[in-house]
Amino acid sequence: MNQIVRKAYAKINLGLDVVRRRPDGYHEVKMIMQTISLHDELRFEETGGKEIILVSNDNPLLPEDAKDNLIYKAAECILREYGIDRGVKITLQKNIPIAAGMAGGSTDAAAVFHGLNELWQLSMSMEKMQELSVKLGADIPYCIMGGTALSEGIGEILTPLPAPPHAYILIAKPDISVSTKFVYENLHADTLQKHPDIDGMVDAIRNGDLHGITARMENVLETVTEKTYPVISEIKEKMREEGALNALMSGSGPTVFGIFEEEDKAQKAADRIRELKLSNQIYVTTFVNVSL
């Protein structure tokens, strides 16, 4: 039976600015998105039936649970768009922490667009996949593209950028949950004292200047989360103490990442954070600049 396997890479935000809150309630952003080597894996198999079957980490999801999942919604979107009258079994091996600010759900949905495009030979262009997927989530079009990108508007305007220089990325997710809605509701974009130098970071990326990139790492959402969850600041501080060029919260959190030039320093920092019990979901990764 035909079978396709796809990797779904996590993302981090090297810089994140909120420009303003629009009259419709959405926030206009300007941010640098970057895929990293931490990934989920999805396997796609045709079935004899007509249902979408979703299995996660060897546990079949009940239909009522599966239908709320972005993977299911992405598959349903493709079936509807192309009038496909066939079933598919999607098996997910979940490695990316959930609700972590790393687009774990969005990247899985992006893998569905790529996987089913190949399985059913639909010949969808990247633009077509992005156009369909934006209805499901603002981060999915970026995840379909992957790599390094400047993201503007409400996240739908994407400008591809060259890969940054090689580095080791330490990921640490503290054992807390952060509501994205809470963060944005408590962010006062119009009164922010300082905005990240996203344009300067774009130049540093184009010039292959790792130190220029890390010197400009800022995330305005930290102005909300660090007050509520001091562990985020603690993890950042420990990473810098252990030799990170810089450390930052990704997205709306709570995951923190640090950028290191040497793998042994990243590993040592990981050991220290684990020892201090600041996080038990810790990974040493690298930048990835390939499409799904």
Per-segment meaning from a language model:
Residues R43, K89-T91, L248, Y283-T286:
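Residues embedded in well-ordered beta-strands within globular domains across many folds
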Residues K50-E64, V112, N207-M217:
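Short, basic/glycine-rich phosphate-binding loops at helix/coil junctions
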Residues T91-W120, A138, L245-F260:
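Glycine/serine-rich anion-binding loops at beta->alpha junctions
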Residues M1-A100, E118, L122-E127, I154, ...:
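ATP-binding N-lobe of GHMP and related small-molecule kinases
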Residues N2-K7, G15-M31, L122-N246, I259-L292:
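ATP-dependent small-molecule kinase catalytic core of the GHMP/sugar-kinase superfamily
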Residues P63, G101, T223-V224, G258:
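A generic structural signal for short
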